[in-house]
From Swiss-Prot:
Quaternary structure and partners: Homotrimer.
Gene that encodes it: ispF
Keyword Acetylation: no
Organism listed in the record: Salmonella arizonae (strain ATCC BAA-731 / CDC346-86 / RSK2980)
Enzyme superclass (EC): lyase
Pathway noted in the entry: Isoprenoid biosynthesis; isopentenyl diphosphate biosynthesis via DXP pathway; isopentenyl diphosphate from 1-deoxy-D-xylulose 5-phosphate: step 4/6
Record-given protein name: 2-C-methyl-D-erythritol 2,4-cyclodiphosphate synthase
Domain of life assignment: Bacteria
Amino acid sequence: MRIGHGFDVHAFGGEGPIIIGGVRIPYEKGLLAHSDGDVALHALTDALLGAAALGDIGKLFPDTDPAFKGADSRELLREAWRRIQAKGYILGNVDVTIIAQAPKMLPHIPQMRVFIAEDLGCHMDDVNVKATTTEKLGFTGRGEGITCEAVALLMKAAK
C-alpha cells in the first residue's frame, strides 16, 4: 500500500462562481488561478500522484504552459489517474478536506463525491469529502481564500 498527501490553496479574486470538487458553486468572489482553481481536485490529484511517486500536479500540468490556462481540473484528475493506473495501481480510498470560511460546502459535497467517483472509476464508498472552517483564524478565516488537503491510498493491482 502507498499513501499520498496533497495540498492546495487559492486566493479569492475577481468574480465568482467558484469550482470546488468539480461543482460550480455560486459565490460573489472567484478564485485566482491559472486553471479553473479547483483546490479540492488539485489537492486530490497531488495526493494520488504522490502515492504513485509521479511528482505533483505542477510537474505534470505546469502553470507556465498556456495549454493549461483555464483547464478543467476534472480532466487533469482523469489524466493523472490514467498515468497512475498505467503504473499498475488501483485505488484504496481518498479523503478530501476543504477548509473555507465561506461559501458553505455542505450542500455541494454529495455532487463532489459523485464527480470524483466518476473520474476515478470507483465506488462512492471509496470517496470521502468533508469541509471545515478555521474558526475565523488565518488566511482562510479572514475570507482571503480556500485551502484543501487530501490523502489517497493506492495498492498494486493483482497480476
